[in-house]
From Swiss-Prot:
One of its GO terms (cellular component) is cytoplasm. Monomer. Signal peptide: none annotated. This is Peptidyl-tRNA hydrolase. Its main location: cytoplasm. It comes from Cereibacter sphaeroides (strain KD131 / KCTC 12085). It is found in: Cytoplasm. The gene is pth.
Amino acid sequence: MKLFVGLGNPGARYAGNRHNIGYMAVEAIAADHGFGPWRARFQGLTSEGRLGSEQVLLLKPETFMNLSGQSVGEAMRFYKLTPADVIVFHDELDLAPGKLRLKQGGGHAGHNGLRSIHAHVGEAYGRVRLGIGHPGHKDAVAAYVLNDFAKADQDWLADLLRGISDGAEALARGDGAKFQNAVALRMQPPKPEKPKPAAKAPEAQAPEAAPDARSALQKLADRFR
């Protein structure tokens, strides 16, 4: 079994926040791949289904971001999972809006949700870092992540979530390259081929003159008419 965790804060007031893009990612997977209804478990909401041959549990911790590790740890212990079975979708200030990167293990880079998961299960789990951009100054970060995505962000956000859903099966079986390709195809669709120039029609040739059947005497007479 794989555990896909989407980080965010519970409640309608936070639903459209940049900080909740992890929730949005797992919700898109659930909707597009026929997962079961969301149920309250492990201090969060879970939905079960399959991605290809892999059984997958989607988890949205409802502990609020800073305590996400409590929910993740509880689910892992119940299913006897290791950090290698876990992939966490989270917002990433250090990536431009719409950019996506995979990471296995490593530090939490100051992200409070990841910090909590580190404290409960260690750092060896996988992450899908979802770029939301940076407000430009560290003092503006809290307000920035707890505000909704702007209208101008909606197109790339929709494409990113569709790409994540497209590539979810590849991600579940460990094919990170194919997952990233699926996202890239949504974010940068192939350019339409330029129409080939129409072949030139062959130029019409002037009809050949009919041979002159007049006798030499008739030709001479015609000159003096």
